[in-house]
A protein has these predicted regions:
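Single conserved hydrophobic/aromatic residue that forms the stacking wall/gate
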Residues: 1-14
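Generic low-complexity segments that are intrinsically disordered, proline-rich and/or Lys/Arg-biased
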Residues: 6, 53, 69, 210-213
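Extracellular/periplasmic, surface-exposed regions of secreted and cell-surface proteins
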Residues: 16-35, 39-45, 72-129, 140-441
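Proline-centered flexible-loop/turn and helix-kink motifs
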Residues: 23, 52-53, 61, 108
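Sec-exported N-terminal periplasmic low-complexity segments
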Residues: 46-51
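A subset of solvent-exposed loop/turn segments in beta-rich extracellular surface proteins, enriched
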Residues: 55-75, 133-146
């Protein structure tokens, strides 16, 4: 038996296939693909910050003007970006994502499912730097050339791959007024990024034409070549378990456990961390003593406690040193320039998982034939071993560490009314949130 779905649009494609091989075994796959040509848009931030008293354009010289002296060192006339830098970027992005799975039901109450997912993207960008002249009444000749007065081109190619595999064993059973679902699993996640960029400016008297067909670094002066690159890999491995139980459909309980390992801390000995959660709910409106309340359709009381982890930092290898180009020096006879390197940040061999402990209690209710919905929650969250970067001071490089603890607590209340008048439906809602933050250490 096959179940299929396919769609195509301008620059994208979607396809899904499911096959029932036997009565208790099925396989399938899903695929998404897209080709995107991002528009060469310009930021509006400069326009918002520009002093409104400045003249935009000088009619006599036929040039856009610079901003007043107190601003021109920080930014350009926004019309320079809109008009003179328009259509100077060509980008082409591709993305393909999908998954394949197999699902096997056995021994009446068991199911084993394997899912393999992948997401791949490739982004290419070419940029052109034109020669831009502006009117500036404060300079000799009243005409100023922005930048170094040379045309230039740059290219950048970035690829990113994300791969995830999930292996899940589920037990599900209902007996009498009891219902139980238990899940055990093992998951892996891998993320890799590679970026390579290069740039050149024109040779003496050889202006690079403003033609996208020419925007390749090979057209520039080799003596002005610069380049940059980035590459990193990250991975996590997780073992997990979860239990969902309810009695009579009104007494609810859940509990979970997971053990996560992160490559971010693989050189510190702290890569593994355990996390837990428990929760309970009482569907109070299903009790006999609540049946006669006609204006109340549903009332549930709930509470939960749990821990979560965070491994995310801007630095892919925070426990290892990273060198970057710094100043150069001249040595030897004949003289030669030797590049210098410095630490990009101070590595920390003692880094560990950031851990968040949170609990909340609350209630949900529906009134007046489910037209009015209410939800209220009081929560408290404490973050320990906070992962953060310490800025460098007086020329020193930044550092990374588990720098403290923060407490957040507050109340969240939401009301929503949904109804229909004739053929017209409407929805009115509102919410109230309070939050109090406190630095504990």
């Amino acid at each position: 038996i096959r179940d299929a779905q396919e769609s195509r649009g301008l620059g994208d494609v979607y396809k899904r296939q499911d096959y029932k091989v036997t009565d208790n075994f099925k396989v399938g796959f899903q695929f998404n693909g897209a080709r995107m040509l991002p528009a060469d848009t310009k930021s509006v931030a400069t326009a918002l910050r520009a002093a409104p008293v400045a003249h935009v354009f000088n009619e006599e010289y036929g040039l856009y003007t610079t901003l007043p002296g107190f601003q021109k060192a920080q930014m350009n006339n926004p019309m320079v970006d809109v008009e003179l830098k328009a259509n100077t970027t060509k980008a082409e992005n591709y993305r393909a994502s999908g998954n394949v799975y197999g699902e096997w039901d056995f021994l009446k109450h068991f199911q084993f499912k394997v899912v393999y997912s992948m997401d791949y993207s490739s982004n290419s960008t070419r940029k052109y730097t034109p020669i831009i002249k502006v009117f500036d009444n404060s300079v000799e000749g009243k005409v100023e050339t922005l930048g170094d007065g040379k045309t230039g081109v740059s290219q950048e190619k970035q690829t990113e791959t994300k791969v995830q595999s999930d292996y899940l064993l589920t037990y599900q059973n209902t007996w009498g007024e009891h219902s139980l679902t238990a899940t055990a699993g093992f998951t892996t996640y891998y993320n890799e990024l590679e970026l390579l960029g290069a740039a050149r400016t024109q040779g003496v008297g050889l202006v690079i034409p403003n033609n996208p067909d020419k925007w390749y670094v090979s057209i520039g002066d080799a003596g002005t070549a610069t380049n940059n690159s980035t590459q990193w890999e990250r991975s996590t491995v997780s073992m997990l378990g979860r239990i969902l139980y309810n009695y009579k459909g009104r007494y609810l309980f859940n509990g979970s456990f997971r053990r996560d390992g992160s490559s971010a801390f693989s050189y510190t000995g702290n890569q593994w961390q355990n996390f837990y959660s428990i929760g309970a709910g009482w569907l109070m409106s299903e009790e006999e003593f609540m049946k006669d309340i006609t204006w109340l359709d549903m009332l549930k009381l709930k509470g939960s406690w749990g821990t979560l982890g965070n491994q995310n930092l801007d630095k892919p290898y925070p426990a290892e040193p990273l060198l970057s180009n710094a100043y150069s020096a001249v040595f030897g006879t004949p003289s030669a320039i030797y590049p210098g390197y410095q630490l990009s940040y101070l590595p920390n061999p003692n880094l560990r998982w950031e851990k968040v402990e949170a609990w909340e209690v609350g209630a949900e209710a529906n009134f007046f034939r489910n037209r009015l919905h209410f939800e209220g929650v009081y929560y408290k969250k404490t973050t320990k071993n906070l992962l953060a970067e310490v800025p460098g001071i007086s020329g020193t490089v930044p550092g990374i560490g588990n720098l403290g603890s923060i407490e957040n607590k507050g109340v969240e209340i939401a009301l929503n009314w949904r109804d229909q008048i004739g053929d017209w439906g409407y929805n009115i809602g509102g919410n109230l949130t309070t939050i109090k933050n406190k630095v504990l250490s």
